[in-house]
């Protein structure tokens, strides 16, 4: 869409293409971000699902970890799904040795909290923020938000009460993968944040 702010998808590892496809379908000027100079060109960023410890190592290796932290602290709208939620959390309860998050979201998360790949599942979630219609959510080796600090807001829980979606200012995080369900409302909600900041 002409005149749309540019939105990046962190393209170090994970389901980058799936997020780009959703963003393009919504008319966004979406691009891959692999280097600090590419990060400087975007008005919003999606951190995709994948493996959070690998993303952390790669971000440090290519010199993106510091610029990402600075951009988040500076108010850049960022949406993290699954591993992206882990990357945005202020605290990783069970990170591997040396693993660091980017921080910004006042939450503590536990990696792979729902179990292994074989225990992945799908369910419908209520999102009053996004409308009355439930959202179909895909959970793949998903994290869980174990605690939510006073600066963050819970957006959704699974039926047993565990938190799976949070928001804080320009930051969004989901333990599930809306890019795989066909429901574009979460990406639309994120784009509203991006447009509101430019």
UniProtKB/Swiss-Prot annotation:
Annotated Pfam families: SNO
Keywords noted in UniProt: Glutamine amidotransferase, Hydrolase, Lyase, Pyridoxal phosphate
Catalytic activity entry: aldehydo-D-ribose 5-phosphate + D-glyceraldehyde 3-phosphate + L-glutamine = pyridoxal 5'-phosphate + L-glutamate + phosphate + 3 H2O + H(+); L-glutamine + H2O = L-glutamate + NH4(+)
GO molecular function annotations of the record: glutaminase activity; pyridoxal 5'-phosphate synthase (glutamine hydrolysing) activity
Cellular component terms (Gene Ontology): cytosol; glutaminase complex
Family note: Belongs to the glutaminase PdxT/SNO family.
Function of the molecule: Catalyzes the hydrolysis of glutamine to glutamate and ammonia as part of the biosynthesis of pyridoxal 5'-phosphate. The resulting ammonia molecule is channeled to the active site of PdxS.
Protein name: Pyridoxal 5'-phosphate synthase subunit PdxT
Encoding gene (name): pdxT
